[in-house]
Amino acid sequence: MTFLKISLTLLAVFYISISTGFARDFASMDPALTAAKLQGSGRLTWWGFHIYDASFYRSGNLSSSEFALDMRYHKSFTGISIANRSAEEMKRIGVSDIQAALWGRELASFLPDVESGQTLTAIYVPKQGTTFYYEGKRIALIPGADFSKAFFGIWFDPKTSAPKLRAELLGQSCPPPLFNEAC
């Protein structure tokens, strides 16, 4: 019986340390996300390679407009390659070549190189835009709903190149109001 109690206690401590280790403190990044809750998470793989794990957080209730997308990378990438891929994905969902190239250059101007285990987080707040964080530190703000819709559309637009990841992130819920998509 004592062995069972010790085992259960160790298991509980392990579970708590794991779950709090992956929790994000969005309130310290943006006060609009004080009550952010995980809505869904998933893994992006490409040709069998684990690229990153993504987690989608919503503020308060599901009709709230504020949200965050947190990505923990499992491969190393240059900031320029992340920016270029983002621009390509924006074109895939219908952004013009010219606009995607402009936004790609803007992303390339601040996105850092990432190593395995590091995080990039993007937070959307209406009338403010998208704020980017690297390892929890603010690195840039791109104002405007047009950019935000294009950037987050990489994951949430129905034409995404990663429909399985989209479904995992959204869970049983609708996309954020930014997308005006009927459920």
Model-derived segments and their meaning:
Residues 7-17:
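Bacterial N-terminal signal peptides
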Residues 1-6:
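Positively charged n-region of N-terminal signal peptides that target proteins for export
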Residues 22-134, 138-183:
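Terminal leader/tail segments of proteins
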